[in-house]
Amino acid sequence: MNSSGPGFAVLYRWRLHEGAEESFVSAWSRISELLLSKSGSLGSRLHRGPEGLWYSYAQWPSAEARDQAFARESVDPEAGRQMRAAIAESLPEIVLESVSDFMVLPKNDA
């Protein structure tokens, strides 16, 4: 555990078209894995919330790192199209500054 963490995080929120959840999760997962492995992302999580809202929390080393990653060509254009097709409504993103971080990631014993 660490009392301070990444200084930049973003919360994304969407409403999805009915029946598009599986397609969205697949596309979101593909893009998130590529951003993590190739574009400097520190990782992200996808959550389903109440009232049909979906949330993604993404961490980056800095706002500049995210801006640089998003300025490049899409990490997977087809997954991007698939994700956009599943979204009925995108709500404004919320930029967050980490103040204290005690999140523990499970160890992968595989």
Question: What are these language model-derived features?
Answer:
Residues 17-19, 63, 99:
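Generic structural motif
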